[in-house]
């Protein structure tokens, strides 16, 4: 039995524990040390006094000593949290947080104070690297006040102080050029980039790469997409040539024994000749090392080149603009926040401070704007301090993609919502009854609520959705339903299936576990309005803690073995318990869980098959929607359509609500395999409309072609439902259909005949299709069919 991964539920599994873990440290810190929470009047007076003392110290000195004080008391502390570095990053696909307890304390000075002293250092201080740092901090202060033009004037004056041939002058020019690009001032950016590339700058590959990156952005913004692609490609090639040369020189300098000497010779020939079948290990490592970008400059060039190539393939040669505001729900603007417009290829990794292709701060009114954006699919991410997000949430969803088309002028306003308050069970309440009464704050305009639970035990957490589409703000859940929870997740201890975390297997059936819960609120369109889990960091926002203990049962001897992570012994103990009492549904459930976990790790097909009769018995004792769907999915994999249809129909009865988009997609494929093309196509549409990632679009396109739809119509569907799969290779189905159209023009009758044959093999689930794909020779049709086989 295969482990099913539903995209949206996977995200809940990954992100929900993260969010709760973020809340908990802050909550516990508040409980342990309330004195560090909201500033009292005495604390405010202390800060005010310290500010006055610092101002007096700065104002009472002059000359070099004054500049030294500005550097040590303002510029250097400002580096503790540089621009675009925040406590919390929130996005559609992921969230992250950090808190460095060793950070310098925040500046005592007000923004106006910092502006004055930073400007003085930039215009009168020593010409050193601290001048560049001060210039960046000064530009930031002007930007967040909404007076970026004043910052540009100061930068211009600073550049005039410095030799035009110095690297420092060039860095300042590139900084100013990037600011002009971000502001949409192409003319100013062009002049600044020309100045930055004036003769005399040699041996500065990092600055050369940055100049190429900015210049390519400018060319695209001006409408010269082909010129931008050529420039960034040349810049990348030049950068990599210098990089490779440095590695070759480094290897040559490592001379020693004969093996090192041979490594050096091979390394010198790495770029231009064929490497022998068994190269030295050091050369293998170097080869692998050079395949990946090894600096932010190289990564930015690669990213831009790929974005421009994708835009060119789609015929998108004109830039776009996206702007908006970031506010709280009461209308208060959120200033000094980071806004990151991240392309689809980049959203699977954490935000890279200061190196994202499109990043900007919100000004005093919460405004932000991106100009010269390359068309494509993007997601917005926010950078916030703990203070900014404390008690609030951004109700963003996994599939919140922004499609940016040529010449678009889009507006995307972001509104933070107050966190939902939980009522019961809370604050580590111990429950011993037959049900759990969940209750939470009612939310205006809420159409439904989703209840999720998290199991915390032995240093690990495991989360899942308990109930969806709840219409009121309270619900009673039988403990037996909670006991049905569980799956398995791994820990760092142990090897193979013995590394499965006990808490993930026992779930809510562990009376020693501490459990927590959360609520998400949805409107009538299925959009998230707000949620309960988030950042609560002080006594005004902490509210009730979402923890409780469920002690309605005691651990069995077999359970104790699971707790001790003696899983082989536990497996036999549960087998013995079930043999002694065929009505022992807990022993049977745990037996199925353990066997499934072991089969998954060992790839033992016979063990997998052996779980099915037990799962059949389990659904007789505990007929839950998830258990029944697991059976349906098993028979789907076996192409046993009679059994599949039986269990899928039963699943729909037990679910009592519309199925998840994943379930609909699987059922659509099953219907297609059974020759029910019309119903399959209808189910595909229902799945795709619910799933913003469009996971099953490839199968839907195959079904449409099998139904005799022309390639032109199928192309429109591919464009309507583009696949999104961050973190893995995304298939451009529209491109594949376009290539098939071009291939068909040569011999349309032959193409149509072969397409029909391959689709018949596909819908019959015939192994001959894979044999045909594995044959020599490439074609657009073969590429398409290969991609279709990978859907699911």
Where are these regions (language model features)?
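Structured interaction patches on ligand/partner-binding surfaces of diverse proteins
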Residues: 237, 283-295, 385-411
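Beta-strand-rich domain onsets/edges
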Residues: 287-321, 327-332
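Short, acidic Ser/Thr/Gly-rich low-complexity loop/linker segments typical of extracellular
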Residues: 347-367
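A short, amphipathic beta-strand motif
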Residues: 320-328, 366, 414, 558
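Long, contiguous interaction/recruitment modules in multidomain scaffold/adaptor proteins
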Residues: 2-41, 413-559, 563-575, 579
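Alpha-helical repeat scaffolds
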Residues: 69-73, 111-122, 149-161, 187-198, ...
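A short, solvent-exposed beta-strand micro-motif common in secreted/extracellular proteins
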Residues: 366-367, 374-389
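Short, ordered, surface-exposed loop/turn motifs in non-cytosolic proteins
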Residues: 189, 322, 328-349, 447
